[in-house]
Each structure stands twice: as structure tokens, then as C-alpha cells.
Design a protein with these regions (language model features):
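Conserved alpha-helix/loop element of class I SAM-dependent methyltransferases that forms part
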Residues: 1-17, 34
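Short glycine-dipeptide loop
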Residues: 18, 42, 113-118
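Class I SAM-dependent methyltransferase SAM/SAH-binding core
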Residues: 22-24, 28-80
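A short acidic, Gly/Pro-enriched loop at the edge of an enzyme's catalytic core
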Residues: 79-90
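A short SAM/SAH-binding and catalytic strip from SAM-dependent methyltransferases
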Residues: 89-101
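A short glycine-rich, Lys/Arg-flanked "PGG" loop and its adjoining helix->strand segment in the class I
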Residues: 103-115
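C-terminal alpha-helical "lid/dimerization" subdomain adjacent to the S-adenosyl-L-methionine
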Residues: 120-174
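C-terminal lobe and adjacent flexible extensions of AdoMet/dcAdoMet transferase-like proteins
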Residues: 176-182
Length: 182
């Protein structure tokens, strides 16, 4: 329940077998299996990016244990990217709310997205509809460096056209699916 909706969000990327995918804030690689299910091992490629070397060490172990040969791991700051290439799809899976300069991370995602590409953000929302429990959840998440009271959806709509935002589980989380024109 804590990290609800990963499969649905990855499906919204609209991946093809030959897609080139970037996951920003990949952490330990928990989303890799969902993404790789859509990619052909010889044609599609997944690049996992994270700021934390410790998280990437765990992701590296996961990749090696499963024998995934079409996964690259990069340690970098999502707000200052220069990967030298563009991607068909970019995914933020419960990571945007942990990035202090999150607008810069979204701008960098836009720069690294190919024309016609898709960016999907799946993250915690404001918990509207949770009544007196909302501040408790937000406080607990803040202890874990997750900030939910920022206008993520508004920035997505500003940067990506079209952009569709949906809320799930009474405002527990949201998906924002944005595109960059042809």
C-alpha cells in the first residue's frame, strides 16, 4: 500500500520493445522489473539514475542477480543532468517529492525527453479526503524526506502538453502523465 500504483504508472509510459527509458530517482531498482517487462532485451534500454551511491549499490546487486543486461546505472543530481542523449520515456516513481529542487528536476526531464516522448510522475499527494489523518501522514512522510505540499501537478501542466493528472485512494497518491509534442 505504501508505494501503490507502480504497474499502472509504468503502463502509462506507453513503452515499446525498443524504448529508451530513464528512471529518475531509481533508488534500489524496485521499478525495474515493471519497466523491463515492456522492453526487448536486445532493443530496449533502461537507465536508472539516483543521487545516492548506496541506493545504486543495491540496484546494481538487483540487476546482477536477475541478469538484466539492458540496464545502465548512473549516479547524478537530477537537477543538473547532462546525459548526452534523449529518452522515449522518463519515470519518477515516488522520487520527485524527495528532490529539494524538484522544478529543476522536471525541467531536466523535459530537456532529456525526445519529441513525442512521455514523462510519468507517480508520487504521494496531499491526502485530500483523509480528514484528520492527512497531517499525520504528511508528518510521517516529512520525517522520511518526502514533501507532499508542493504544486507538482501545476508544474507538470506548465512543462508538458498535454498533461493528465489523476488522484488515487482519496488523494493518497497521484499520477501525472505529460508529453512533449511531436
Amino acid at each position: 500500500m505504501i508505494l501503490h500504483g507502480r504497474q499502472r504508472a509504468v503502463a502509462a509510459l506507453g513503452l515499446r520493445p525498443d524504448s529508451q527509458v530513464l528512471e529518475i530517482g531509481c533508488g534500489t531498482g524496485l521499478n525495474f522489473r515493471h519497466i523491463l517487462a515492456y522492453l526487448a532485451p536486445a532493443a530496449g534500454r533502461l537507465t536508472g539514475l539516483d543521487f545516492s551511491a548506496d541506493m545504486l549499490d543495491q540496484a546494481r546487486k538487483r540487476v546482477a542477480a536477475r541478469g538484466w543486461l539492458n540496464v545502465d546505472l548512473v549516479q547524478a543530481d537530477a537537477t543538473q543532468l547532462d546525459l548526452g542523449r534523449r529518452f522515449d520515456a522518463i519515470f519518477f516513481g515516488y522520487s520527485l517529492t524527495m528532490i529539494p529542487d524538484w522544478p529543476a528536476a522536471l525541467r531536466q526531464a523535459r530537456v532529456h525527453l525526445r519529441p513525442g516522448g512521455t514523462v510519468v510522475v507517480l508520487d504521494f499527494s496531499r491526502f485530500h479526503g483523509w480528514g484528520p489523518l492527512a497531517p499525520l501522514w504528511r508528518g510521517w512522510l516529512r520525517l522520511n524526506h518526502v514533501e507532499t505540499l508542493r504544486p507538482y501537478e501545476d508544474e507538470m501542466r506548465r512543462l508538458f502538453e498535454p498533461c493528465e493528472v489523476r488522484y488515487w485512494l482519496g488523494g493518497y497518491n497521484f499520477t501525472a502523465v505529460g508529453r512533449v509534442g511531436p
